[in-house]
Amino acid sequence: MKSLKYLIVVLAVMVAASALAGVRTDAQMRRAANRVLKSSRPLEQVAYYPGMALYRQAGGGFAIISSDDNSPAVLAYSTNSTLSLSDDNPGFNWWLNATRKVMLQQQPRRETTKPDPSRFPTSVQPLLTTTWGQREPFKFMCPFDTYVSDLSQYGTYTPDAGHYSVGCGPLAMAQYMNYYKFPKHGMGEESVTVKYDQGDVTVHVDFEQATYDWDNMIDDYQGDYTREQGMAVAQLCYHCGVAAQTTWNSLGGGTTDQRIIEAFINHFNYNDTAHYVPRSRYDEPAWMEMIYSMLSSGNPILYSAKDINIPAGIIAGHNFIIDGYDENGLVHVNWGWYGVENGYFDIALLNVLQYTYDDWQAMYVGLYPNREHLPGDVNDDGKLGIDDVTDLIDFLLAGNSAGNNQADVDADGRISIEDVTTLIDFLLSGNK
């Protein structure tokens, strides 16, 4: 009997010890930051919150480290992005605030859900190359921020005028569509009403009359760009906003997940089975497995999150893109804020089934272009030719293996040299 009591006491002590978190010292956290950044450059601690410290290094790069040794050390990092900690980047601030809430709670020991190497690549490099934002030139066709009596000016490219910001939803849509370079033309029509003190103004877009100039959209607009390059991206952002029935005002541009889905399907010819799924329906392994599956297939993920301040009755929505992951299961996020604070983040720990905070999350699944063209029409010009062969070879040499359904000439679910030979054989046989 005494032995049994002794065993129970020992087990209870072991369980209690495993539940009690130790605290990482500043030196330990700095070492963890240097390891993940693969750098010995001096680190500046720019902020400390209960459970986590934020470090950045000169010349770019940052790491957010957990001080709770029940948690994996690295919560987020980037080897090149800047850490501004301003209020300007709403998506990053959502993640930071949600993570702070989690770290305030007593946590059981946890390990990050990593990609299963028998099913997924160890890591996926960021799929997006764009570092777009919501201000100039992206907003130069959005509604004016003050009333303009000449209604013909609305929806035109006017760099010298004041405009409402694009909004994170339309901007995320634009970056997502630019990845696929699809569509060339839109479908249908849509109108939205903008409210001013002087009266309402309704803006209208006929998407079928629009041509999206993908070749003139560049990755980075923070340097010099031509008028044509500015117009190309401004039109896309404006059309995304109207298609998603965005409400534009001094706070920016707001829309809903359902409207974004409907915009993709009804106006941009994306798969009509596309839908969004809330995280609350999934546990951590299932949620992360969905993410690894989509990314390893070459498809970025449009992600949605909300800050819900119940006492104040305020709901702030955010949209951004997850476009890669590392070997430790942290996902790469493009926040849509000019590349600022883009990096790898632990979103697995934001598990609404385990923690009691009011931050809603969802991701869009099945959101792919409806490519209704010939397999092999890689350049999307409506015919097959030697240009498609060279484009396909360039596509493969760039290290791509997915993300362009038309490049999958032999329809085997992957893109490889066999697609090149199949296309050449097809052309040599006299087919076009």
Task: Kindly give the residue locations of the regions a language model identified.
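Cleavable N-terminal signal peptides
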Residues: 9, 19-20
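Bacterial N-terminal signal peptides that target proteins for export
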Residues: 1-8
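Structured segments of extracytoplasmic/periplasmic soluble domains
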Residues: 35-39, 68, 171-183, 266-267, ...
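Active-site-adjacent substructure of cysteine-protease-like catalytic cores
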Residues: 43-61, 262, 266-334
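Active-site-adjacent structural segments surrounding the nucleophilic cysteine of cysteine proteases
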Residues: 74-253
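Cys-His-centered catalytic/binding microenvironment captured across papain-like cysteine peptidases
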Residues: 22-48, 63, 70-136, 142-143, ...
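Cellulosome-associated attachment modules in secreted, modular CAZymes
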Residues: 370-432
